[in-house]
Swiss-Prot record:
Record-annotated HORMA domain positions: 13-203
Keyword Ribonucleoprotein assigned: no
Transmembrane domains' residue ranges: none
Protein name: Mitotic spindle assembly checkpoint protein MAD2B
Subunit and partners: Homooligomer. Interacts with REV1. Interacts with FZR1 (in complex with the anaphase promoting complex APC). May interact with CDC20. Heterodimer with REV3L. This dimer forms the minimal DNA polymerase zeta complex (Pol-zeta2), with REV3L bearing DNA polymerase catalytic activity, although its activity is very low in this context. Component of the tetrameric Pol-zeta complex (Pol-zeta4), which consists of REV3L, MAD2L2, POLD2 and POLD3; Pol-zeta4 is the fully active form of DNA polymerase zeta. Component of the shieldin complex, consisting of SHLD1, SHLD2, SHLD3 and MAD2L2/REV7.
Function: Adapter protein able to interact with different proteins and involved in different biological processes. Mediates the interaction between the error-prone DNA polymerase zeta catalytic subunit REV3L and the inserter polymerase REV1, thereby mediating the second polymerase switching in translesion DNA synthesis. Translesion DNA synthesis releases the replication blockade of replicative polymerases, stalled in presence of DNA lesions. May also play a role in signal transduction in response to DNA damage.
Biological process (GO), any one: double-strand break repair via homologous recombination
Keywords for the protein's UniProt record, in alphabetical order: Cell cycle, Cell division, Chromosome, Cytoplasm, Cytoskeleton, DNA damage, DNA repair, Mitosis, Nucleus, Transcription, Transcription regulation
Source organism per UniProt: Gallus gallus (Chicken)
Compartmental location: Nucleus; Cytoplasm, Cytoskeleton, Spindle; Cytoplasm; Chromosome
Gene3D superfamilies, alphabetized: HORMA domain
Length: 211
């Protein structure tokens, strides 16, 4: 067993790669399971050795990729506290918030040969949980849209400004109505703990969705 800092072996980059790929799959699957878009734009793929649904819509895919491309440098620096997929009704009020709370330890005690396969097993469990989350959630009203919010540590603000210049994909301070949900129902979905990553996924669901 070896103890490494986050700077060793570009380990922050490895974690960011793993997380970015996972979040891309998770966002697509959430949009499919919660029927934000017609099921006809999704195709079945295999990720983490389980079937998932991924969008075939070029503009939607580009938005998701651009968003996560900008999140990735923040993940590398351990500046991300939460990534939130917010589903909004026609009035742009949130009906559901899928919250990924992310913690990366500063010191890593790892066995490198088993590390990534172990993490992928844990991420597979998240994907399976998202696949069946509609069983514990109420139906959403028709005409929903979505947005992705990133909660960063305060020191990350300067990094985000640099990323904006480089990537030409502007970060916008979240509107309060996208963030706030009055007295939501909290539904824990999954928690994982590994040597490189701790992550918790839960859903905040609005009590009265107006379906």
């Amino acid at each position: 067993m070896t103890t490494l800092t986050r700077q060793d072996l570009n380990f922050g980059q490895v974690v960011a790669d793993v997380l970015s790929e996972f979040l891309e799959v998770a966002v697509h699957l959430i949009l499919y399971v919660r029927e934000v878009y017609p099921i006809g734009i999704f195709q079945k793929r295999k990720k983490y050795n389980v079937p998932v649904q991924m969008s075939c819509h070029p503009e939607l895919n580009q938005y998701i990729q651009d968003t996560l491309h900008c999140v990735k440098p923040l993940l590398e620096k351990n500046d991300v506290e939460k990534v939130v997929v917010v589903i909004l009704d026609k009035e742009h009020h949130p009906v559901e918030r899928f919250v990924f709370e992310i913690t990366q330890p500063p010191l890593l005690s790892i066995s490198s040969e088993s590390l990534l396969s172990h993490v992928e097993q844990l991420l597979r469990a998240f994907i399976l949980k998202i696949s069946v989350c509609d069983a514990v959630l109420d139906n959403n009203p028709p005409g929903c849209t979505f947005t992705v919010l990133v909660h960063t540590r305060e020191a990350a603000t300067r990094n985000m400004e640099k990323i904006q210049v480089i990537k030409d994909f502007p970060w916008i301070l979240a509107d309060e109505q996208d963030v706030h949900m009055h007295d939501p129902r909290l539904i824990p979905l999954k928690t994982m703990t590994s040597d490189i990553l701790k992550m918790q996924l839960y859903v905040e669901e609005r009590a009265h969705k107006g379906t």
